[in-house]
Amino acid sequence: MREIVHIQIGQCGNQIGAKFWEVIGEEHGIDCAGSYCGTSALQLERISVYYNEAYGKKYVPRAVLVDLEPGTMDSIRSSRLGVLFQPDSFVHGNSGAGNNWAKGHYTEGAELIENVMDVVRRESESCDCLQGFQIVHSLGGGTGSGMGTLLMNKIREEYPDRILNSFSVMPSPKVSDTVVEPYNAVLSIHQLIENTDACFCIDNEALYDICFRTLRLTTPTYGDLNHLVSLTMSGITTSLRFPGQLNADLRKLAVNMVPFPRLHFFMPGFAPLTAQGSQQYRALSVAELTQQMFDARNIMAACDPRRGRYLTVACIFRGKMSTKEVDQQLLSIQTRNSNCFVEWIPNNVKVAVCDIPPRGLNMAATFLGNNTAIQELFTRVSEHFSAMFRRRAFVHWYTSEGMDISEFGEAESDIHDLVSEYQQFQDVRAGLEDSEEDVEEAEVEAEDKDH
C-alpha cells in the first residue's frame, strides 16, 4: 500500500493534528483505543495509508508528534486520544522556542532534530511503499516554523524522491500571539518554496472571518478554528484514504495541481460550513455545494480568488450524488466565469467523487485552488516583515541564536520574486498575438529562479 507518514510539530501543529486523527478515526471506524468498530469494508480498504496494523488488530497512526516544550504533548497524552499513539512517537524538548524562528531552526530545534529523524526513519521503515510525508505546523511561532522547516530540509536530504506536503497555518494580526510573527512566517515561506511539493495555506484571518460572518460566532476560540481546519484536512485527504480514481496519491495530486515548481501554494475551501457541534438542517443540492465551494467566503486563505485567476483546481465531492450532475455544475461554473481560469492550461479543473460523506453530513465538498490571488497573502505578510526589518526591530533575538542577518534579506527577496511570478502568470492571456511568447518568457523566468 502507498503509506503516508504524518508529522505534527509545535503547539498549533499538534492541536490541529490531534483533531485530524480524531476526525479520520471517526470516518474509518477506529475508536480511541485503536480498535476497528466500523460498518463498511471501504473504511478498511486503504486504512494502511495512515494507520499501521499492530498486534491484536490494533490500528496505530503513522504519526510523529514533535514540540520543543512538553505542554501540548502532555495534554494529548492525557486526552482520550492519548493511548492511540505509540508512546515513542512523542518527541519533545523542555525549553520551548519562545516564538523565535532561529531557536527552532538553529539552536533548540537542531539539538532535538536527530531524535525526531530517528522516529521518522522508524515509521518510514515500517512502510511497504512510502509515498511521502505530510507536515502540520504553523508559521507564526518558533517551533512549527523554525524546527518544522529544519525537519523538511532533513527529510528532503534523506528522502529526495518522496513527496513532501505541508498544511501550513499562516499568521494574522487578528488572531495573533506575538509581534515577530511576520519574521517567522517570511523565513518559513522562503524554506517552503524550496522544500515542499505542495503547501495547503490555512490562514487564521480567513478562519476567523468564517467563524465571525458565516457561522455567526461572536468570540471564536482556537477550538472553533481547528474544527474548520480538521474538516478541510479530512476533505483534502479523502482521495488518499478511500478508493477512487482521481488524485489517489500525493504524486498524482502534485502533478495535477503544480504547473510550475515554485507555484505550489494552494487555497483550500469547504462546503457546507457548519459550526462545531451543530448539524445542518437542510440537505444541500450539488448546485448549492458547488456554488458555496467557489465562494470567496468559504476559502480558508484570506485572499479573494476573484482578483486572481485559477491555474488549476481540484474538487472532492463526498456523499451519494450523481457524477454527471457534478460535472455539469463545474462545467457551468467554468463557462460563466471563464475569465477566472487561465485558458492556456486546458482541463485544469479536476473532480473526484467519494461515496462516504463526512460524519454528520449527507454531502460535502472540498476545494483546492492554485490561484494567483494567493500572492495577496504573501504580500500582506511581507509588508509587515519589511516595516519591522527596515528598522531592524527585534533582529537581535535572531542573530543572538547564530543566525546571519543576510538570511532576512534573502527570504524577503524570495517572497517578492514569488509574488511577481504569480502576477506574471495572472497577466498572461491566451488568444493574443504574443501570448505564447508571454507564457514562454514567464516559464523561462520561473525556471531560472528554480536553478
UniProtKB/Swiss-Prot annotation:
Pfam families: Tubulin, Tubulin_C. GO terms for biological process: microtubule polymerization; microtubule-based process; platelet aggregation; platelet formation; spindle assembly; thyroid gland development; thyroid hormone transport. Residues 430-451 are annotated as: Disordered. Its main location: cytoplasm. GTP binds at residues 11, 69, 138, 142-144, 204, 226. A motif (MREI motif) lies at residues 1-4. InterPro entries: Beta-tubulin_BS, Beta_tubulin, Tub_FtsZ_C, Tubulin, Tubulin/FtsZ-like_C, Tubulin/FtsZ_2-layer-sand-dom, Tubulin/FtsZ_GTPase_sf, Tubulin_C. It comes from the Eukaryota. GO terms for cellular component: cytoplasm; intercellular bridge; microtubule; mitotic spindle. The modification Phosphoserine is found at residues 172, 435. Residues 433-451 have a biased composition (Acidic residues). Tubulin is the major constituent of microtubules, a cylinder consisting of laterally associated linear protofilaments composed of alpha- and beta-tubulin heterodimers. Microtubules grow by the addition of GTP-tubulin dimers to the microtubule end, where a stabilizing cap forms. Below the cap, tubulin dimers are in GDP-bound state, owing to GTPase activity of alpha-tubulin. Dimer of alpha and beta chains. A typical microtubule is a hollow water-filled tube with an outer diameter of 25 nm and an inner diameter of 15 nM. Alpha-beta heterodimers associate head-to-tail to form protofilaments running lengthwise along the microtubule wall with the beta-tubulin subunit facing the microtubule plus end conferring a structural polarity. Microtubules usually have 13 protofilaments but different protofilament numbers can be found in some organisms and specialized cells. Interacts with RANBP10. The MREI motif is common among all beta-tubulin isoforms and may be critical for tubulin autoregulation. This is Tubulin beta-1 chain.
